[in-house]
Amino acid sequence: FLKEGIDLLIVSPNESEPITPVVEKVFNRGIPVIVIDRTINTDRYTAYIGGNNYEIGMEAGRYAAALLKGKGEILELKGLSGSSPAIARHAGFLKILEGYPGIRIVRSVAGDWNWNIARQVMTNLINTPLTYDLIFAHNDVMALEAYKVLRESVSPLDPFILGVDGLPGDEGGIQFVLDGRL
C-alpha cells in the first residue's frame, strides 16, 4: 500500500507488535498515522484515539478490592495476550492489588476477548478444586460466559463477576447489567 501513495494511514491493531514496523515506516515517510483503540510499541504515530486501558484496569482493581473488602481470591480472564488493552488492563489491575495483601489472583488465563474461548476456559476450571471470590474479565462478553457457565453448572461458587467495556446494544455490557446477567 505504500507504493500506492497513501495520504493517511488509520490502524486499529489486533496486537501491538506485528503492525509496529509498518506504522514506523509509514510515519518516517512523513505520512500521518492515526492509531485507534489499541496502542502499538512505538511513539512514531500522529495521533491515538482510544481509552486508557491502564486506568481501566486500575478502576477494576479498586472496585474488586471494595467488593472483596480487602480479602479474597480472583480468577482473571484476560484478553488476547499480545493486545495492548489486555496488557494494560492486567497491569493496572495488579498495581491496585499491590495495596491489598489479602487479595490475590489465583489464576490468570487468556480468554482472547472471545465468548467461546471464555466458555471453554470456565468449563475446564469448573471441574478443578480452584476457588475464587471474584472473576475479573477483560471484556463483558467473557464475563457473561463466566456467569453462564457458573449458572449452568452445579458449582457452589458464587463469585462477583466484573466485566469491562459497558458497550450499548442488545449484546452489550450495559444490557447484561440491566437484565441482571452481570
Language-model segments: residues:
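A residue-level marker of the well-folded mature domains of exported/periplasmic proteins
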Residues: 1-182
